Amino acid sequence: MSMLCYTLIIAFLIGIWAAPKSEDNVPLGSPATPDLSDTSCAQTHKALKTSRNTDQRHPAPKKAEDQELGSAANIIVDPKLFQKRRFQSPRVLFSTQPPPLSRDEQSVEFLENEDALNRNIRSKRENHPVNDHGEYSVCDSVSVWVNKTTATDIKGKPVTVMVDVNLNNHVYKQYFFETKCKNPNPVPSGCRGIDSRHWNSYCTTTQSFVKALTKEGNQASWRFIRIDTACVCVISRKTGNF
């Protein structure tokens, strides 16, 4: 009887040990079911790392305003430099805003905001009313404020013109009022009002010198540069007409 009991107990234990387990094929220390939260965290970390590496290889482009301020901040102009300026020209203007189309007759002016520009325009209209008495120009010209990066100085050498001027923590732009011919031949015969039977004529742009703020290396200085300032008529007598 006791022998039968021992046999049954041994058979029962062998059956328990031999029973298959659902986790037998899972590596040691790993759960039978994957943890979705851990997988999501791993994927998120990988995405952030990839994005960070991409940002380092392709940095975000700087805004145009930041680039403009950075280039102007390279050279800070001493206000005393303007006190030493001589031979001021109404064709040179330092402004934080685009200047009006009409040229003011003052020697030099610093315009810092839109109100100053409006006052400049009103002053121009009041001081210079438009009169039309049937007068015509020999040549047609156009005048406009422009920025210049390079020019020719009074010695005939090329110079670098300062476009942005950092003065008292304000960034000003240097503008030049240029005048040039619209057309070398406003009429088929050349200049308007010239007797084409006796004269050859054509319109051409002429230049003059103005004092401008230029730079050489990291130094700013005043130099005379050449700009377009007028449109004139050039005539020559036709051969055989005396």
Swiss-Prot record:
Biological-process GO terms, alphabetical: cell surface receptor protein tyrosine kinase signaling pathway; modulation of chemical synaptic transmission; negative regulation of neuron apoptotic process; nerve development; nerve growth factor signaling pathway; neuron projection morphogenesis
Coiled-coil segments:
none
**What are the disulphide bonds in this sequence?**
139-203, 181-231, 191-233
Instruction: Please list the residues that make up the propeptide.
Output: 19-125
Q: Where would you say this protein principally sits, based on its record?
A: secreted
Return the annotated region ranges for Disordered: 46-69
- Compartments where located: Secreted
Residues annotated as glycosylated are 147
Q: Which GO terms describe its cellular component?
A: axon; dendrite; extracellular space; synaptic vesicle
A GO molecular function annotation here is:
nerve growth factor receptor binding
Identify the domain of life. Answer: Eukaryota
Listed Gene3D superfamilies: Cystine-knot cytokines
What is this protein's tissue specificity according to the annotation? Expressed by the venom gland.
Q: Which UniProt keywords apply?
A: Cleavage on pair of basic residues, Disulfide bond, Glycoprotein, Growth factor, Lipid-binding, Metalloenzyme inhibitor, Metalloprotease inhibitor, Protease inhibitor, Secreted, Signal, Toxin
Region forming the signal peptide:
1-18
Q: Where is the composition biased (Basic and acidic residues)?
A: 52-66
Q: Does the keyword Mitochondrion apply?
A: no
Family classification = Belongs to the NGF-beta family.
UniProt subunit comment: Homodimer; non-covalently linked.
Function noted in UniProt: Nerve growth factor is important for the development and maintenance of the sympathetic and sensory nervous systems. It stimulates division and differentiation of sympathetic and embryonic sensory neurons as well as basal forebrain cholinergic neurons in the brain. Its relevance in the snake venom is not clear. However, it has been shown to inhibit metalloproteinase-dependent proteolysis of platelet glycoprotein Ib alpha, suggesting a metalloproteinase inhibition to prevent metalloprotease autodigestion and/or protection against prey proteases.
Which protein, by its recorded name, is this? Venom nerve growth factor 2
